[in-house]
From Swiss-Prot:
The lineage of its organism: Eukaryota, Metazoa, Chordata, Craniata, Vertebrata. The keyword Membrane applies. Component of the GATOR2 subcomplex, composed of MIOS, SEC13, SEH1L, WDR24 and WDR59. The GATOR2 complex interacts with CASTOR1 and CASTOR2; the interaction is negatively regulated by arginine. The GATOR2 complex interacts with SESN1, SESN2 and SESN3; the interaction is negatively regulated by amino acids. Interacts with SAR1; the interaction is direct, disrupted by leucine and mediates the interaction of SAR1 with the GATOR2 complex to negatively regulate the TORC1 signaling upon leucine deprivation. The GATOR2 complex is negatively regulated by the upstream amino acid sensors CASTOR1 and SESN2, which sequester the GATOR2 complex in absence of amino acids. In the presence of abundant amino acids, GATOR2 is released from CASTOR1 and SESN2 and activated. GO terms for molecular function: zinc ion binding. It comes from Xenopus laevis (African clawed frog). WD repeats lie at residues 60-102, 113-157, 185-224, 226-264, 268-309, 399-441. Zn(2+) 2 binds at C793, H840, H843. GO terms for biological process: cellular response to amino acid starvation; cellular response to nutrient levels; positive regulation of TORC1 signaling. A zinc finger (RING-type) spans 787-868. A zinc finger (C4-type) spans 740-786. Belongs to the WD repeat mio family. This is GATOR2 complex protein MIOS-B.
Amino acid sequence: MSGSKPDILWAPHHVDRFVVGDSELSLYHIESAASPGSELKAGSLRLSEETIATLLAINSDTPYMKCVAWYPKYDPECLLAVGQANGRVVLTSLGQDHNSKCKDLIGKEFVPKHARQCNTLAWNPLDSNWLAAGLDKHRADFSVLIWDISSKYTPEVAVPTEKVRLAPGDSETCSVVTKPLYELGQNDACLSLCWLPRDQKLLLAGMHRNLAIFDLRNTNQKIFVNTKAAQGVTVDPHFHDRVASFFEGQVAIWDLRKFEKPVLTLTEQPKPLTKVAWCPTRTGLLATLTRDSNIIRLYDMQHTPTPIGDETEPTIIERSVQPCDNYIASFAWHPTSQNRMVVVTPNRSMSDFTVFERISLAWSPTTSLMWACSRQLYECTEEGKGSSSLDQDIATKMRLRALSRYGLDTEQVWRNHMLAGNDDPQLKSLWYTLHFMKQYAEDIDQKSSGNKGSLVYAGIKAITKSSVGTTESFRHSWTCSDRQADIVHYSSEERWLALQLCGWRTKGADADMGPFLNSLEQEGEWERAAAIALFNRDIRRAIQILNKGASTGKGNLNLNVVAMALSGYTDEKNSLWREMCSTLRLQLNNPYLCVMFAFLTSEPGLYDGVLYENSMAVRDRVAFACLFLNDSQLSRYIDKLTNEMKEAGNLEGILLTGLTKDGVDLIESYVDRTGDVQTASYCMLQGSPSDVLKDERVQYWIESYRNLLDAWRFWHKRAEFDIHRSKLDPSSKPLAQVFVSCNFCGKSISYSCSSVPHQGRGFSQYGVSGSPTKSKFTSCPGCRKPLPRCALCLINMGNPVSSSPGASKSDEKVDLSKEKKVAKFNNWFTWCHNCRHGGHAGHMLSWFKDHSECPVSACSCKCMQLDTTGNLVPAENVQP
């Protein structure tokens, strides 16, 4: 290393010691600093804010150093081999106390026949007496010499006495060895060396134009590959078959199991490389250094599964680090500290540097959060109040709702809100609206020959606009009351339908509110029931409901006060009753109690106190408007309320917009606000098939929800959703993805075998129906060639079989007696897309439960391993 840049070596068995060598060898001890700003002791260097290095010893007795290697065993602990410019290898030490064994080795020299530069040294990690040296080319000598350091002094004529270098001390104890244990690599230069850890007799050498693996058990043979990347060969300590080497600005990664070509080539900067080194504490992390650079480039080789037989390069994540501002002469990884290295500059300035680990974050579909940093794996857990926030996350809600089959009840549609937890008023309003729409659309379609049922799904906004010009006004008196004042009501067929959608009316022309009010009383909605009774001119029933609500165990005492106030109602404008009710209204918290007084104290046609009470349910406000507003007032109010619902994304507004484009706009605002693509998908599928389902937004919500179910591994739930979707929207039924055709004539077997031609695309048609009345198709209907045989039972495909090849014939008869429209899954055709072998699905499943290879003899295809999802199981039954 004389006249060259310094290099660093860590002690193999002392993680706090390292050597820096150039023209001399310096041994340092690294330790933690007392404090960042403390003064340094004499002979100490600050490497970082946390560490300092103290000089322990210096050895300047070995000039013309070109390479250094540290003895791999613990004893002797500070024995080093130094390769010199004349090809000699000298054993030396760093001023430590030595036992007799070490004293016999120190100063020992290993001299080649012909002098030339020693480029590299490598101790055998298993048999530590073997030391390999790589020399420059000589036409009459070998370039790879393996010395046995335990060899005795055997002087030869070829080594003149005056040329033998003696180490300091008694010359009688010094020795020179000139006979190497092995000589390899004739007529070529050796640039780098390393022993292969898997076998102590294998040596990898980077020669001038090739990489060669020498087996010391048979030195006449070698494995080699031609390449220019012969410098700096180094074995990955975590993967002994992976080797790195370099040439100029390129790094080659080799797999010794397939040594014909590099598995990966890394192109560096235009400047030539000076060093590459594998990280000893991290798998697949390679560091490289270029000449005259202050940057160390890191290559993180990711281990990703690839299909069998694919020759794909490993995924590489590249990054650069800058340990210091000056040019870096060399670096060395710390042998035990994670991602830690020491770098040295040409002027011997050193720095202790830690490469901060990339944090890999993983957020599972079930909201579990984990991340990896260094050798640690962390999991984020919720404690205390945090768990409630997780429960409120929409993803958690959608997952729980999917488990409860939310949205799939198409008969009693209103029950879906109960499957969602019955804790969201907007969802309750939505599903009741969809229930009423379905109910009355079917009722209208049965009574009329036209397509008026679709008007129901268009919403109340469209319904009320169609009633313009047909509305009649009536003056009605209070029911069961002596009041003389009349109230103006508006009525039409369309307004009646709107009241039905709001839930205020039932089927037929009967206007009896009794059942509806009774249901509200059962749910404890006393205030709402009383208000609706009052709006329908039944003040006596309203008072009775309030008194009944006040008498219950959890009744509100304000109900009695309101009931007493209602009993004194008078239509005189300047009465004391109106003045007191206006004051009382401001003191009430319940919106329905407030609107009752607002209604009674309002002028005819001026009901803003009721219509714009935002705490009141939208369906009740709309129903009230349909009763008491004329056509122009109703149209303006519905338009204004619809726009408010669309902007807020309030699901109660579906009553107004229906499942139209306005409804899609409203749902879009709702999804933007909540992320609930589940409700959006089921909602838009409820309506009769229309162009709305072709809207890109609707399709996006549906596909997003399907992807969510797949991510949760709810494959059965996703299949149920697809079936539900195809029933409500037949146009969404996908076309066949696979069909069976004859190898001889090319005609589709599925079309010919199907009893219903237009159903021939279904995959289930590839089996045999369970009905005993159907024919068995064991040959192609087109050319009469026999169908392939099952690889296990050897029966032609098309024959019904039992679930296992060894089952009795009686089992087959029992199976055939079951009348089904589609073939059982066990009878379906199935085959490997790689080797094309297959058979009955039931037999294949049974075989691959215990085997990984194809059941066909002489076929080594790993059929089951080709399916990356084969080992995954559904998670429908796993609670979050």
